[in-house]
């Protein structure tokens, strides 16, 4: 079974806006993609960054660990670059730049190969840059998926018998 670390806190929102309400993380934390709520940022001549805390997951068994961001850019020129970074505290554990392929709603993903020691201290940084300053970047969903937790080792002890007379 898979575990999901989903946004559960707005750590630093910059100029990113929520489609409704004030919590950005609540717009993109759903387990099933919902394109009716989102976060967005417009007219970014320079990088616009949001940092989101992620929910805790148990230390996983070995297997593929993947960051997924469901996004769209509407510049009409495919000019928005989205940089996504998974961090443990302030240390980058993996990042990917996406500069094309999301001029329609798309799931952008990459695998994490670096080791992570504390799965309760993860955050996701998303930066959008449009050198033309004409586009809007939308993010509809974001999460980090990991395998199920490793099975606990069962320890057995030899039987102990006590006879009382």
What are these language model-derived features?
Residues 1-15, 19-20, 143-165:
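Enriched but not universal
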Residues 32-50, 98-102, 133:
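Extracellular beta-rich ligand/substrate-recognition surface
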Residues 92-115:
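Extracellular carbohydrate recognition and processing domains
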